[in-house]
């Protein structure tokens, strides 16, 4: 992808990178400014572990970034958050550990220009609104490698940011994608694809909603 995107390509580690102690893209925090928004990229990987964490340093950095920018902020990390309404409270939770997820929710609840949090890891499409985070959306995006073979595109507008779901198109890649659809006794397809509302949607600028409510 480097040949296509050049210095616009930003990497964040996942759990498979951390298993072998790779330092590739080992950047705890990255700030990327684009027209109309700021991208806050967090390394949630834990050395040799499948699940993720967010440090106090990263939380403080995110809060400071949100306090000094007047744009919408999209937050990216590999691991998805723990959902207090759905997930058992365990430190070996598959995504970001519960206490760290709660620290992230607290920043979202205070900083309304944090528009949403975007993750991979689960290889599925899912969107959750977390009450403890002020109702902000926490999103998981399916992977390129397996069904449905997808990437997410983000379009920045005044008043919100739109997620557009895009599938791979090369015939050979599609053939492989259809093979992986049958994993887990045929249940993987429905798990990974998610609902239409999990794939294409608008994340509203939460500052506008707060102003109306006030």
Where are these predicted regions, by residue range?
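Core catalytic region of metal-dependent phosphoesterases/phosphodiesterases
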Residues: 1-28, 100
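Catalytic metal-binding/acid-base residues of hydrolase active sites
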Residues: 15-18, 45, 80, 121-125, ...
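Short acidic-hydrophobic surface loop/beta-edge motif
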Residues: 28-35, 128-132
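Conserved hydrophobic/aromatic beta-strand scaffold that supports enzyme active sites
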Residues: 31, 39-41, 151-153
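Active-site-proximal beta-strand elements of phosphoester/diester hydrolases
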Residues: 36-46, 74-76, 137-142, 164-168
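His/acidic metal-ligating clusters that form di-metal
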Residues: 40, 49-137, 187-211
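Active-site/pore-lining binding-face segments in mid-to-C-terminal subdomains
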Residues: 113, 120-172
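A short C-terminal boundary segment appended to hydrolase-like catalytic domains
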Residues: 157-214
């Amino acid at each position: 992808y480097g040949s296509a995107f050049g210095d616009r390509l930003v990497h964040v580690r996942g759990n498979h990178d951390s298993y072998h102690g790779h330092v590739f893209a080992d950047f705890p925090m990255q700030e990327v400014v684009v027209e109309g928004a700021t991208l806050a990229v967090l390394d949630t990987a834990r050395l040799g572990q499948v699940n993720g964490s967010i440090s106090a340093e990263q939380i403080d950095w995110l809060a400071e970034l949100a306090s000094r920018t007047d744009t919408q902020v999209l937050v990216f990390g590999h691991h998805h958050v723990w959902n207090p309404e759905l997930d058992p409270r365990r430190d070996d939770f598959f995504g970001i550990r519960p206490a760290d997820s709660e620290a992230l929710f607290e920043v979202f609840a205070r900083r309304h220009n944090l528009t949403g949090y975007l993750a991979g890891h689960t290889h599925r499409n899912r969107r959750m609104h977390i009450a403890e985070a002020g109702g902000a959306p926490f999103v998981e995006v399916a992977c390129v490698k397996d069904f449905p073979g997808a990437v997410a595109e983000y379009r920045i507008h005044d008043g919100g940011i739109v997620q557009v779901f895009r599938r791979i198109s090369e015939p050979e890649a599609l053939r492989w994608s259809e093979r992986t659809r049958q994993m887990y006794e045929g249940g993987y397809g429905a798990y990974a694809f998610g609902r239409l509302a999990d794939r294409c949607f608008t994340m509203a600028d939460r500052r506008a909603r707060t102003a109306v409510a006030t």
